[in-house]
Regions:
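N-terminal Rossmann NAD(P)H-binding glycine-rich loop of SDR-like oxidoreductase domains
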Residues: 21-41
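Mid/C-terminal beta-alpha module of Rossmann-like enzyme folds, strongest
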Residues: 230-296, 314, 330-337
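Conserved Rossmann-fold NAD(P)-dependent oxidoreductase catalytic core, especially the SDR/UDP-sugar
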Residues: 107, 111-155
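Substrate-positioning beta->alpha
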Residues: 162-163, 191-196, 210-232, 238-242
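Amphipathic terminal alpha-helices
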Residues: 2-11, 20, 312-320, 324-342
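Catalytic helix-loop patch of NAD(P)-dependent Rossmann-fold dehydrogenases
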Residues: 103, 138-185, 206-208
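NAD(P)H-binding glycine-rich loop region in Rossmannoid oxidoreductase-like domains
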Residues: 53-59, 63-107, 111, 115, ...
Length: 342
């Protein structure tokens, strides 16, 4: 689908002060929606594209493709004429830690920021994740003052936390870097999380963890795009902001609603939390001692994402970015149902 799900732009929209933006991760779920959102507001977007297929995707959405990857030697030249960078590219694998993930998330962030500075870019939005705080224990209404944990849940949390440190360390008087942390990104045109969820339902592998009756924050992709726009205009360099749909919801209610929008019956099977935690812990150990040759069915990283409460306070984004969701959870679910029946 190529139509935008972001909030419509006003005729005299002044929230985006930057007229030419360089985007990494443009062919991904969030990246595609960011291109639609920004192009609709008259912003020129140059998107990094690793392949011909990725280039076709971003060009079809109205961006100019710059062929290469995060480590492209001509990256700074590709950013010429841009005055802002949105760094959305990441290896989001929740499996065992890998060197590839470390290189993409950590070194890739450093290289992209260095290129942006060389190109004279003034503002950077670094898309992070609430998973930088994940350890496997509940995160209950936390805010940005919570420190990064010394022992994160897994490779994704560890490398994204280090990417945050790299991004924030790069902030300076002439190079403003703002970090956004969304949680549970969802919405129309999802080609990653929702299809994976539905495949688990189809195959009979889906099960609730302790019934799924724990709270979670969520972030509709249109709300994330809106937050990026606000952060470009109002975000303070060197600061981190949580972004969500505002009110939390139980994990079971949210996932059930997503499944139902696609015409599937919601499974009832449930597994005790301690069993899932044990399987995840053993899986991590087996992957480590086998040097990655054993691929576990579950990791502590995946457990930390889906088995415990994860909610946070978005008061800082509301105060400093003037952020408020532009689409409600009910509207987003209705949009998914409508798209399914077209």
């Amino acid at each position: 689908m190529t139509d935008s799900i972001a909030a419509p732009a006003a005729a005299t929209d002044k929230l985006v002060p930057f007229r030419h933006i360089f985007l990494t991760g443009g062919s991904g779920y969030v990246g595609r929606n960011l291109i639609r959102h920004l192009v609709a507001r008259g912003v020129a977007v140059t998107a990094l594209a690793r392949s011909d297929a990725s280039a076709k995707i971003v060009e079809a959405l109205g961006a100019v493709a710059f062929r290469g990857d995060l480590f492209e030697s001509t990256l700074a030249a590709g950013m010429a004429g841009c005055n802002a960078l949105i760094h959305a590219a990441a290896d989001t694998n929740h499996g065992p830690a890998t060197e590839k993930q470390r290189r993409v998330n950590e070194e890739g962030t450093r290289v992209v920021l260095d290129a942006a500075r060389t190109a004279g870019i003034a503002k950077v939005i670094h898309l992070s994740t609430e998973s930088v705080l994940a350890t496997g224990r509940p995160l209950v209404n936390v805010d940005e003052t919570m420190p990064l944990p010394p022992k994160p849940a897994g490779g994704y949390s560890r490398t994204k936390a280090e990417a945050e440190r790299i991004a924030l360390a790069a902030n300076g008087p002439d190079f403003s870097v703002v970090v956004l942390r969304p949680r549970f990104i969802w919405g129309r045109d999802d080609t990653t999380a929702l299809p994976t969820l539905l495949e688990a339902v189809r195959s009979g592998k889906f099960a609730w963890i302790s019934g799924g009756n724990y709270l979670t924050s969520t972030t509709h992709v249109a709300n994330l795009c809106h937050a990026v726009e606000l952060a470009l205009g109002h975000g303070r360099g060197g600061e981190v902001y949580f972004i969500s749909d505002a009110e939390p919801v139980t994990f079971r209610a949210m996932v059930s609603a997503l499944i139902e929008t696609q015409g599937f019956a919601v499974p009832e099977k449930t597994v005790p939390r301690f069993v899932v935690r044990t399987v995840a812990t053993i899986g991590d150990v087996m992957a480590k001692i086998s040097g990655g040759r054993v691929v576990p069915p579950l990791t502590l990283q995946a457990y930390a994402t889906s088995a415990v409460e994860v909610t946070f306070d978005i008061g800082k984004a509301q105060r400093e970015l003037c952020y408020t969701p532009v689409i409600s959870r009910e509207e987003g679910l209705a949009e998914l149902r409508s798209a399914q029946h077209r």
